[in-house]
């Protein structure tokens, strides 16, 4: 056991750490939520992680994305994630896929090779495609709902999509998942009423703490599932 994971081992035991080391997790979207998912998975000792994102780091990401720094602006998010992961755990197997996961390229990726899948994508069409395909190969998946226009991290919850409320993205997903035959879906969502900025800009407002908290909650659900808690 690497010394860097000794304190985690005290929680999960040697068997749990071995399960984490042997796990392969896919994270789709490494922005405000997904970046924190990756961070916590790497620091928990997950042995293999694949990340999928086609975006580059922008200065406007610095307020909430853990990979966004002055010296990473302009870099591919997946590459920044890879370099950061290797700094945390040089032994990790980390694959960076620079792409937007969409229905027209979904056949390129074999989801059955993953222990767990995290959906931190913004686009409804892509989310539905990923979720449906994960369900088709019986790979557990957890999906992030909206974290923009929110300030209360304490109002984040883990629930089935059918039991969500207040979240506009979750409302859309509840409606659309029926068309895809998706009966169950674990999500992290916020019960907080969205705070809509009083201007003409439709870009969601964001804080440093709500997306990050959502990502850490998701990572916790994944880790607990892998070790059998």
What positions do the PLM features span?
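Conserved SAM/SAH-binding loop
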Residues: 97-106
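Glycine-rich phosphate/adenylate-binding loop
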Residues: 2, 109-116, 121-129, 133-137, ...
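N-terminal charged helix/coil linker that caps or initiates catalytic domains
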Residues: 1-25
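Conserved N-terminal Rossmann-fold NAD(P)-binding element of oxidoreductases
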Residues: 27-29, 52
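Hydrophobic/small residue at the entry helix of a nucleotide-binding pocket
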Residues: 33-34
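Glycine-rich phosphate-binding loop and adjoining beta1-alpha1-beta2 segment
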Residues: 46, 51-89
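Conserved S-adenosyl-L-methionine
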Residues: 42-48, 136
